[in-house]
Amino acid sequence: MNYVFYHTVKVVVSSMSHFNHRVYAVKANHKFQKLHVIGSGMSRTLSQRVLPKFFRRKLAGASARPSQLDLLPEAESVDGLAKVVRKIKTEFGVEYVYCWHALLGYWGGIHPDEENVAKYGSVMKYPKHTPGVLTVEPSQAWDPLTVGGVGVPSPDTLAHFYVVTHDYLSASDVDGVKVDAQAVIGALGYKNGGGPAFARRVHAALEESVRAHFPDNGIINCMCHSTENIYNFKSSALARASDDFYPANEASHTVHIANVVYNSIFMGEIVLPDWDMFQSQHVAGALHAATRAIGGCTVYVSDHPGKHDFEILHQLVFPSGRVLRCRQAGRPTRDCLFRDVTRDGRTALKVWNRNFVNSVIGVFNIQGASWSRATNQFASLPKPISATLAELCPRDVEGIADRSTQGASFVVRSHRNRRIEILRLKECTSIMLMHKDWEIYTIAELLEQGDIKFAAIGLTAMYNGGGSILRIDMNGRSANVTAYGLGELACYASRAPTSVHVDGRAVSPDFDPRTGALSIDLGATEGTHELQFNW
């Protein structure tokens, strides 16, 4: 990197980027204190320090000018992290609180010249990326961490650093950690045995500390797609499958969906993919909610306080906070594997998944944008976005033939259109999707006993309504179904049943003889319900 302005760029990037903040002490109590700042003859109360003790910027090789906040007297005992966590849990009913930290403490690592962290033996290192990484993403050559450096602790002290950090968090009633900024670890392995060996030691120390301090295996791995990270997840079960969701970057909203779906082909075999948070009251809120519903992933939002779309959230989450999570990671259907669902102008993305009994396919028009290496940002395509035609059939769900009766037919119900069709394994239905439009289809095997045909489809009010069906069996002229949830349950029947019971109580179903649509009210109480149908 013998650029003419290299040193100037280094100072500017390092000084301006929060990626070059470094840890200079573990406790973050200062961030949560209420301190009085005197300025312009007026006193104002701050609920947060702009540069908290855990994250304060102290740049190696450059003089750091202290802020006005840094000159205030310390007050360790006031409004600490434990008090904040307790307030969140007691006043707002939040059951679990996780805290963020980077793999090496913060993006810029651990400060090499601070007395409080001197015991970790941190030294400044500048990432050395492999030729393959620089070919795929040339911008890594001038990434803030590459230019500004990372404070890398001695491998022998990492275990102690994690223990001290997690001791503090656990004592503050924190339930787990989200460990970010992992991908750079391989580029910092020189003089530490190489990237893979260094990553192995780091993850072993991290996971051992997590097991000791967060018994529920409370760790989310993030920005961790280099293989030296993924292949060292020995007990970690959850990892991000994508870049961030950027609410203000419109071009990124569709690309994000493509990234998580295609990355889950690989990551879904190793971890539970995390498709990141989204915002419900957002122009792309429903689109992203629909993908999370069938992704088999975590479901969480980054809504601004008071800005929530409950029509969307209620289709994702029950009143108890439970979700109808699919059984595995959502993956693209075979006919999408080698198509460009973001740029070719004609291919809709199709995502398949399985539930306990039924299957699900989501179709999405996410054409029109991509990541530009030339500009190093998400970019919308110049040509207008056209509608795409999506065709889907039951066999798009991998393994469905092995799980079904030979020669079976399937009931296919669309969530938004509420349309019911009966298809054979290779028969298809189709839908025209406008830009950023979507639909979710529940696929339920059609059971047959004599002249009676029946399928339990799922809750009509939930995106992944088919996930509510936990068990079904049909014997003679009766069928028994176990379902979870509340509200309207959709079924299909070739003829109206003579009686239906929910938890032993007789109910009056709605039946449409033209379509075979059979609706049963499970009531307003969320829970597991036993249903019996008789003909």
Name each model-derived stretch.
Residues 92-97, 172-175, 214-218:
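Loop/turn elements at helix/coil->beta-strand transitions in domains of secreted/extracellular proteins
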Residues 335-336, 358-362, 371-375, 384, ...:
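Non-catalytic C-terminal accessory domains or segments of carbohydrate-active enzymes
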